[in-house]
Amino acid sequence: NGHKLDEASQAMSKLQIKIRSLRDISPSISVVEPQGEDCAHVARSKIMQVLHLVEHKLNGNWLMVEDSGLFVDALGGFPGVYSSYVHSTVGIEGIVKLLEGKEDTSASYISSIAFWDGERIHSVQGHCKGRISPESRGDAGFGYDPIFIPEEGDGRTFSEMNLREKTSLSHRTMALKKMVEKLNFPSI
């Protein structure tokens, strides 16, 4: 996902770490989207699929796989691990419609990163709490960004923020910070 790559690159740029797509290493690689109970399971399953295919091509570089989802409290955590599928079928309008008449619109974005450091696979998770806007707002970002208002923000949706602003608050950046700590890099 190019948008995820942009966010990760923005977050890691301070450390002068270049993030590349798996397609740069192996253009024809195909990963089966696993069904799992949480994002951590999905990310771990994906990295295990990929690692045996590209380990010989990594040349000392580490490998990371990220899976994320939007978990809406009033919907029992839905769409959760099915966020991508739900977005492609009912869209953000479908989520807004499901929340009509509900007072509680709290939600969390969760990002799970599985990464291989050259010796073993590690897992980390980042969270961004917020709420769902009753309408789509903004043109930037992707996925559910037009309806997600982060708790730590100023009332704008992720889509109303530029990439730097969004990255400073995002679940993905929180997970990347934890990954950087495990790899003993300076903080991002």
PLM regions with names:
Residues 2-188:
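Anionic-ligand binding patches
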